[in-house]
Amino acid sequence: MKLQKPKGTQDILPQESAKWQYVEEFARETFRKYNYAEIRTPIFEHYEVISRSVGDTTDIVTKEMYDFYDKGDRHITLRPEGTAPVVRSYVENKLFAPEVQKPVKLYYMGSMFRYERPQAGRLREFHQIGAECFGSSNPATDVEMIAMAAQFFKEIGITNVSLELNTLGNPESRAAYRQALIDYLTPLKASLSADSQRRLEENPLRVLDSKEPEDKVAVEGAPSILDYLDEESSAYFAAVRSMLETLQIPYVINTNMVRGLDYYNHTIFEFTTEVAGSQLTICAGGRYDGLVAYFGGPETPGVGFGMGLERLLLVLDKQGVELPIEMGLDAYIAVLGAGANGKALELVQSLRAQGFAAERDYLDRKIKAQFKSADIFQAKTIITLGESELESGELTVKNNVTRQEVTVAFEAIKTDFQGVLAQIGL
């Protein structure tokens, strides 16, 4: 048997990994500006954490979860999304306690898992960046969450970004709309896809975001959630729209957008961008005021979003955004002869101790091959160390761009390499 990675997974090799790290650090810096702190949760959870919060009837739970029974006969699932584990942690660790500063602002990064057909930017193991804010029912929190994502996209260089906005209202408004949708869709049931016929019985709002052509036709004349909002829900949505306009964040209302998870209420949103003539969703989120209480905590409002890292990198690549990746070495030590082996190790370690990125030859190669390695590693300088240098105690340090050289004492490099660099224009 040829051993290969499982279907729907990927190996992120060093050159690509540098891009991942850049995007992750860029996101961390954005979160820091908004006073968010990182939280890390297990990659597997008890099955009920996901099934009860995401929704027993959602595609995620019924079709896509990686779940199994462990050796203790506990029903476990690999996490398919980030919000439910963070809410579970918020409740379990009593982050709602009075001594914890409110609102509680958390962000996360990590692997998620869904059993679905692999495609570009969407694998069975995928990586998500997300943010969650607990403790504020102020619509300004929703808008700040949207603004944070918008700032991230703008500053990292993603273009043609659009914001789609909708509301699901409070539970009363949602229940009224749910019934209106059932009344509208029931006479059309036979024309719906098999999945949507099931959704009509279990979660009719999910029919609205079906991708099946027959379902899209069926919902063209569906009632709008906006017509079923009570006074509170209508005022909340108006406040969100007003504040977005104050911040000059353009949006489009999409009343067919309902999101794939059951826990949302009031504001929901998606950011999309255009790639090769197609619209790709790059971020989605919304408000979930009942989820903390559902997990056994006190009534606590919450709002959050998630974005797929693979999809972000795909968009950055397709839109031609060059990420400023720093890959080069400060110094490469070319080693000539077995007698220089020990001194080369001493020298490279001294450079690293001074804070420089350094490498040396370990393969006893010809000098030309070593110089080629220095170029591949984008080394700023080359230090040549052979038996003659050992005898004299002096080494040649060359600027690998300008070819300017300087001969200095071994000890000078060991103790003040920054001073040596200054002599060759670095």
Swiss-Prot record:
GO biological process, one term: histidyl-tRNA aminoacylation
Uppermost EC category: ligase
Location in or out of the cell: Cytoplasm
EC id: 6.1.1.21
One Gene Ontology molecular-function label: transferase activity
KW Ligase (keyword) present: yes
InterPro entries cross-referenced by the UniProt entry: aa-tRNA-synth_II (IPR006195), aa-tRNA-synth_II/BPL/LPL (IPR045864), Anticodon-bd (IPR004154), Anticodon-bd_dom_sf (IPR036621), His-tRNA-ligase (IPR015807), HisRS-like_core (IPR041715), HisRS/HisZ (IPR004516), HisRS_anticodon (IPR033656)
Residues in coiled coil: none
GO cellular component: cytoplasm
Record keywords, A-Z: Aminoacyl-tRNA synthetase, ATP-binding, Cytoplasm, Ligase, Nucleotide-binding, Protein biosynthesis
Catalysed reactions, semicolon-separated: tRNA(His) + L-histidine + ATP = L-histidyl-tRNA(His) + AMP + diphosphate + H(+)
Pfam families: HGTP_anticodon, tRNA-synt_His
Broad class of where this protein is predominantly found: cytoplasm
The organism's place on the tree of life at top rank: Bacteria
UniProt KW Hydrolase keyword: no
Assembly notes: Homodimer.
Family annotation (PANTHER family): HISTIDINE--TRNA LIGASE, MITOCHONDRIAL-RELATED, HISTIDYL-TRNA SYNTHETASE
Family (UniProt): Belongs to the class-II aminoacyl-tRNA synthetase family.
HAMAP family: His_tRNA_synth
NCBIfam families linked: hisS
Name assigned to this protein: Histidine--tRNA ligase
